[in-house]
Amino acid sequence: MHMHFGAEEMFFVLSGRPVFRNQHGEEEMAAGDFVFCPEGRAGLHTFSNPTEEPAQILAISAGSFPDVVAYPEHGYAWVATRDPDPELLARGGDPGIITRFEIPIE
């Protein structure tokens, strides 16, 4: 799971049956379902797709940069200075993602 300290996120399920997980548990979702994740600890979340059916989710982020994205289960965080460039990420890096910090996150 991860959380943002610079952005809120909204997710709208377009198809499939993805599972949304946050600090309160898991919920299977379906087309038409919506979830809002606020900035900070209250917005801790992740999705999975335990079925063989493809799932599509429209993700909308609203925030500012820099954005610190923390992964408390793994003990690291990213700092982003802007939206990542998908083409640069596919080639192994993006200068908009400054660095990954190995830090204890509680």
Stretch-by-stretch model annotation:
Residues 48-106:
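Double-stranded beta-helix
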Residues 3-22, 60-64:
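Short, conserved beta-strand element in jelly-roll/cupin
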Residues 44-46:
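Short beta-alpha junctions and helix-cap segments that line functional grooves
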